Amino acid sequence: MRQKLLAAGLGNEVLVDSAGTHAWHRGEPPDPRSVTHAQRRGYELTGLRARPVTQADFESCDFILAMDWDNLTLLEEMCPPQHRTKLGRLSQHARQSKAPVIPDPYQGGAAGFEHVLDLVEDACDGFVEFLRQKKDARRVGTS
């Protein structure tokens, strides 16, 4: 997401973060297979560490995008009612794929990781375009 925002000229306007709905892997780096497949596409994940979603995230974030329905449901349960409009699925922004969710890659071997990266890239492209359109609409509305 960060690289796509930078390429779109939005890198200095959007803070990207990642968090999980469970604290099982708190403080751990990404799975080595994720790192390897991401690096093949030019993405650097080595500085990332797992952390759980916190109540502060619901306050400070403009968008909180889940990868699948189960995680979206957990986020809805955790989220204060006044912030539920910030929640959604990353896949709803996909431009090519019609997959309703981005699946867990861990059971699909190398092909599973590549498929998930394809889905994430497509959805991130769509989300960046969504943000660009929102920015353009604000600019037109204030002119």
Q: Which residues make up each language-model segment?
A:
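Short polar/charged helix/loop
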Residues: 1-143
